[in-house]
Amino acid sequence: MNLRKVWGSMWNRSNSCKDSTKAIQVLPRSCSSSISVFDQLPMDILVQIMMLMEPRDAVKLSLTCKALKRLVGCNRIWIFYLQCLQESWDSIFFAETSLRCGYPLRMVSSESEELSFMRVYGQRAQVPDSIIIDGGSGFCKFGRSKNDSPSRRVTIFREFGRIESPIYARLQQFFETIFNRMQQVKPSMQPIVVSLPLCHHDDTESAKASRRQLKTAILNVLFDMNVPAVCAVNQAKLFHSLSAFLRFRAVFFSAVLALYAARQTSGIVVNIGFQVITVVPILHGKVMRQMQENNITLSLHAVLTLKECYVALDYEAELSRDAQASMEIAGTLSKQRFFQTGEILFQPRLAGMRAMGLQQAVALCMDHCDAAGLTGDGSWFKTVVLAGGSACLPGLAERLEKELHDYLPSSICNGVRVIPPPYGVDTVWHGAKLISNLSTFPATCN
């Protein structure tokens, strides 16, 4: 019916262009005498007709004959359908070409002919709605994977204390609170994607034991809540099923999720969290712990409080300016205090702390990555992705990039770029959303 409706408006244009446009025979006469006039219709027009249909109607049309089946299977049509979805096409394309094969990552050919987007569309439509829980060190964001953003947030440090401390009762209260605040959600009905808090990053045996202890405690709590499937996001490492009801697979470090949200598979993630700054090198989705820079511990309560803070591109030049601004926080603060608060990240001594600055920690990490010589081109670590609430300070990405270019030798600094948090404070949550909506996600998490 749709074909007949469109045909009337297309036929005259097709006749007028007959001499200049070569007709392409795509339908055999045996298909149907009522649509035999389409035999001489150019391919581009047929594709445009298909795009006017609903995806389900296009699939039904493909059952008519082999020629229509080949036409409906055209990637161009299904790329159009995917572009009409709420999710960004760039994110969909990145996920389906870079992440669909699981770990270790294997890039699908950039020429999309090897990937059937008709199959991708159908598989994505069948992916169940998951609950994503991003348990950061300061705040927790949670919501459904089909939504555009987290539905709720809770302040972990106020309500639950140090959530990474693997105490069963505390974790049980944490997850029960989340499910109680999400209306019409039962733990036993939907898969869960968990991004574990950034903690115990070192490559020491004690840190490894702490990570295992935390994961075991979380699994035990969710198991007792009858969760059907858990895709726990922490390390790039697979775990075997613990039972027929609770499966613990496709495990990623939360820094990897921030990298995926920026549509990258290799680079350095700088997470500026509630109290700890971590510099995490990642190669093809795997955390390179042996090259990871030690954590920088700073108290960022002031940065979290002063929402008008920013980072000056040139600190000395900004100091010399006589501009003033004010805000009400136990009195009046000058604009100088606004950017001086952010300057602590680069000059911790301003706050009386003995620690290396952010630019020094990132540069040292890059130097370790360069010396390791893991890849031929040596550029995998030159993309820096910022994550964490305090990383959203205006001017931070530009300042860090400038400092790195000034601090690093020319052999390394060429090509270095710093990407601000792609989704602000929700960057890690969106990285988990990218994975949970993958066409291959059910196979990964079952």
How should these model regions be labeled?
Residues 174-182, 344-380, 399:
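Phosphate/ATP-binding catalytic cores across multiple sugar-kinase/actin-like superfamilies
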Residues 112-125, 223-270, 431-433:
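Conserved phosphate-binding catalytic cores of ATP/NTP-utilizing and phosphoryl-transfer enzymes
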Residues 228, 232-235, 254, 401-433:
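Conserved phosphate-binding/catalytic loops in two-lobed NTP-binding clefts
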Residues 41-53, 64-72:
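Short hydrophobic alpha-helical "box" of cullin-RING ligase substrate receptors
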Residues 1-41, 48, 80-120:
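CRL adaptor-proximal regions
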Residues 239-243, 258-260, 299, 355, ...:
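Glycine-rich phosphate-binding/hydrolytic loop that grips phosphoryl groups
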Residues 77, 120-219, 288-291:
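Conserved phosphate-binding loops in N-terminal lobes of ATP-dependent enzymes
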Residues 189, 283-355, 382-383:
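Phosphate-binding glycine-rich/basic clefts of nucleotide- and phosphate-handling proteins
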